[in-house]
Structure formats: C-alpha cells, structure tokens
C-alpha cells in the first residue's frame, strides 16, 4: 500500500511539472495557433538562472523573480523574432524549425556557461520529507500540483475578468474580428508568449531543489508537456492540467512496476494510442467548418 501511495505522490509532483509547462503551450496556442518549442529550455533557464543568482549571494525569492522576468523577456523575443515572421500564413510551419533550433542553441549556451552538471537550489521545503504511512514526499514536491491547479484557475479568472484577458480570448476566438474591434493581435501574442515563459520558468524553479538544475533538464520535459497539451486538447486549460497530472502518475507507475527504462517508451506509446482514440484530444472539441 505504501508503495502505491509513494508512486501516486511522486507522480502528482512530476505531473505538476508537465501541467505547468503544458499550460504555457495552451497560452501560446490560443494566441497564435503556433507554439514555442524552446519552451522546455525556458523552463530550464528559470532553474539555472535562479541557482546562479543564489550562488552570487541573492536571496532565493529575489533570484527567482529575476529569473522569471528574464524568462518572460526571452519568451517575448522568441515570439517577435522566431515565431511571428514565420507564422504569417494559415498553414505556415517555419516557426517549428526556428524555435527547435533556438532551443538547441539555448541549451548549448547554458552548457558552456553553466557547465553540464546539475547544481542544487537550496530550499527549506526540500530538506525533510513528510511521511504518509510508508510513503514520503518533500513539501517542495507537493507545491507543484498545487501551483499547477492554482495557475489553471488563475488563468481562467484572468481570461474572464480582466480587459487584457478578454482581449486574449477574443484573439483566440477570431483574430480578424479582434483586429476589427481595435485589439492588436501582435501585442496579445507578445504578452501571451511572455506569460507562458514565466509560468514555464516558475515550474523549473519549483523543481530545482529536488532534481538539481542542469542545462539538459528541459528538452524532454518540453516535449512531454507538448504531448500532454495535444492529448488533452490544447485549447482546454483544465484538460491540460488534468492530463498532465495523470501522465505524471502513469509514468511513476510504469517506472515502479515495469522499469525506469520503459517509462518514456510506454508513456509515449500511451500518448499515441490516446490520439488514435481521441484525434481532437481527450477534452478537445471537433471544429465545425461552415461552407
């Protein structure tokens, strides 16, 4: 029993990472019908930059705030320089190549300047685990699913109750109509990518005390989070979080009852099967085209 509880707890923690990073893909897709494939590396930048600043003597909260702000700037620059120029036509896909290339460059630069090895981010919440019967989990890990759910509800409130949020929803619904109403879609896209990057960086900072911050920590997380968003139905924030949390639990169960090596293979196989059964995503809606 304790073993199952352990897998559930650590799975929810892992799922919280996927959910937070996948929420970033949701935000970007809603604004531009494109995505930033450097998103996993932005997650890494949040963790790595925070560690570097703390090592320089800054308080953790200040270092984390600077890292999140820097990630937001990176996200905005990526939208302006690597997505917008290559996403002018309805079926344009050039942004895929440019953002993938940028992600490789970011990881390479981080490896050169930071080093390839992981370094810890100190946190009092990662020193003593909380015990639940035969299972244990650090309070730091428990933050991840809590923050993911809070971010989801926060985004929903932001989209519904703020002028900027309603403008972002209008662009997501109909970009042309939003333009005619005086909304600047390019400005909305810039803000969306900055917001997505900030959330991704936050996820990296929250997990850094547990897994250590390293340049290679982001690429696979970003790929899995994108898969989570697609399987959920990328235009559904609640679905993205639910699938993210569930996928984390599934991975830990695979790791525990099959093997660590099988985790990625079986996990991606399940993603493929889910898309075969739900082509629009589990929580997605089939688009109706009127002619």
Model feature map: region roles:
Residues 85-86, 91-161, 188, 253, ...:
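Transmembrane helix-bundle core of multi-pass membrane transporters
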Residues 1-21, 49, 61-63, 89-95, ...:
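Membrane-interfacial amphipathic/re-entrant helices at transmembrane-helix boundaries
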Residues 1-2, 78-88, 280-291:
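Transmembrane alpha-helical segments of polytopic membrane transport and secretion proteins
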